[in-house]
Amino acid sequence: MTVPLPDLMQEYRCRCRADSDIREYLPLLHGYACLYPGVRVLEVGVRSGNSTVAFLAAAQAMGGHVWSVDIDSDCFNRPWHGHPAWTFTCGDSTHPAVTGKQPHQVDVLFLDGDHGRQKVLDELAAYFPRVQPGGVALLHDTRIRWPGEPPGTWPVTRALDEFCEQQGLHWAELPGAYGLGVIVREW
């Protein structure tokens, strides 16, 4: 017996109304993905699936696909598991066995996994080169502290500053309780 897949747009709208740390950015995530016909989204960090649903609803509308990575195998139990527009890889986002399974070209890169400075730098090094010209990298939680990081610092912000300085790039921070960093890959 096949379990029916959820109505992704309805699920997305419900999650936009539900309390979560990403709620204020869900319309933006969805909107960015809707900019690209045949959108290719690479998401690191699924957790409860709020961002995943925003991207999947856009991918369904745009004829695209979402690849998600998370270390938590419980992500296999999401209602949209089996959706033809979703590929999930369970594992460490920077392990070669995981990075090798991800698409080589993406329009939207979303990082919201481990928020330690070094891990974010490693994810940017592994995945930002896959962002196509005109594409975007979005990094959630630019305004949170992380265990093991120096007091008074925001590790995602520090990683963005370091990566962009090394690469000759610029990033912007969108306001909000948790912060969202944006890097646009120039043409």
Predicted regions and their residues:
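A short alpha-helical cap/connector motif
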Residues: 1-110, 114-187
